[in-house]
Swiss-Prot record:
Species assigned in the record: Shewanella oneidensis (strain ATCC 700550 / JCM 31522 / CIP 106686 / LMG 19005 / NCIMB 14063 / MR-1)
Cited function: Removes the pyruvyl group from chorismate, with concomitant aromatization of the ring, to provide 4-hydroxybenzoate (4HB) for the ubiquinone pathway.
Assigned protein family: Belongs to the UbiC family.
Coiled coil, from the record: none
GO biological process, one term: ubiquinone biosynthetic process
The protein, known as: Probable chorismate pyruvate-lyase
PANTHER family in alphabetical order: CHORISMATE PYRUVATE-LYASE
Length: 189
């Protein structure tokens, strides 16, 4: 895996839109994946023999435009979700400092364990709304895909999922790389 042309954090400022606006969504079957209410990790695991989380970086960082405007720093975790050694999803998680100390979740000790397993295994984390974004062929996400030897021929898609814990909110952004979009149409509709 060669991602030397970029450095952590890989994320970029993104214009997200409400998933209810279906005229802006891609064609099926990718649309169903973007709007899937359950764990994306579980859905991905159903399409492969070997699932792997590759950590690109994690640590305290200032949020980007459109992310936590009232926070000066949040915990950022960026990973690749790989199926049978092929990166399918770039995921960026943002956790406010107040949630890092919760006893119900060991965010800092996740290592290569999927975050989805933690969030969907505990009733104290409630899945919330989903927002959608598209990424141009010259975006940082497209550059990341190209550094992974994935050809970016058209815009890419992603979703941002909010999770609530008591009065706190965190979110996970999951961007589908070209390999995922191609395989979803073939392997797991």
């Amino acid at each position: 895996m060669n991602v030397t042309s970029l450095s952590f954090p890989y994320g970029e400022s993104i214009q997200w839109f409400c998933a209810d606006n279906t005229k802006n969504l891609p064609a099926s079957p990718l649309k169903e994946w973007l709007l899937a209410p359950g764990s994306l990790t579980q859905k991905l695991k159903g399409c492969c023999n070997e699932f792997e989380v590759r950590i690109l970086g994690e640590g305290q960082c200032p949020p980007l435009d459109g992310e936590y405007p009232n926070q000066s720093a949040v915990w950022v975790r960026e990973v690749l979700l790989c199926l049978d050694d092929v990166p399918w999803v770039f995921a960026r998680t943002l956790i406010p400092q107040s949630l890092l100390s919760t006893r119900q979740a060991d965010f800092l000790g996740l290592g290569t364990r999927p975050l989805g397993e933690l969030l969907f295994s505990q009733d104290s984390f409630v899945p919330g709304r989903i927002e959608i974004a598209r990424f141009a062929t010259n975006s940082r996400l497209a550059h990341l895909a190209q550094s992974l030897a994935q050809n970016v021929e058209h815009e890419l898609w992603g979703r941002r999922r909010y999770f609530h814990h008591n009065e706190e909110e965190m979110f996970v952004s999951e961007m589908f790389l070209p390999a995922a979009e191609q395989a979803i149409a073939r392997l797991c509709p």
